[in-house]
Amino acid sequence: WYSSMFAANIKQEPMSHHHNHHHDNGQHSNSNSDGSPRQSPLPSPNAPATQLEQYLKQQQQHQQHQQHQHQQPMDRCCAAAMTPSPSNNDQNSPGLPNPMQPTMPASMRPSPQPTPTRATAVATALQTGDKLQLTPPMDVTPPKSPAKSQQSSVEPEKEHDLMSNSSEDMKYMA
């Protein structure tokens, strides 16, 4: 904000000398208002700055250490992931895939679980809607509304079965 105002004032300086004088006053007030807070926090950030530097250095060392540790298991994980059998993966490196596998279904699980609830909610809504629709059209068009109701009720059931199977498979995988 300050740099943009400064640039705008610089552009307007040759146009009017009075505006330049006003800009000097603004600079003076800005320098005073900015200088007093700058001077007061400066001693306090000095100590955290060194702490932050040390902390960042520790983090970098820790990250390098982690990366160096994880390079071999990551390659092993990728190679084991290339092989389709998870049992070999468990036997090769028992420590790593166990945290890896629950995290995968845990991230995958919330997506299948809300969808069956949505499918069941849609199925119940369709069933209630079909019940409401069935009573009036039974007199007018009996064959069409039951066909619609059967199709609409069968589709969410299929989706729900697929989703439940996938979630069960994920649970079995975990």
Swiss-Prot record:
- Recall the taxonomic lineage recorded for the source organism: Eukaryota, Metazoa, Ecdysozoa, Arthropoda, Hexapoda
Enumerate composition-biased segments (Low complexity): 27-36, 58-72, 116-125
UniProt organism field: Drosophila mulleri (Fruit fly)
Similarity remark:
Belongs to the hunchback C2H2-type zinc-finger protein family.
Protein name, UniProt field = Protein hunchback
The gene behind this protein is hb
Write out the biased-composition intervals (Polar residues).
Answer: 47-57, 84-95
Any one of the GO BP annotations: segmentation
Bias class Basic and acidic residues marks the residues at 155-174
Annotated Gene Ontology cellular component terms? nucleus
- Gene Ontology molecular functions: DNA binding; zinc ion binding
Role = Gap class segmentation protein that controls development of head structures.
Keywords, alphabetical: Developmental protein, DNA-binding, Gap protein, Metal-binding, Nucleus, Repeat, Zinc, Zinc-finger
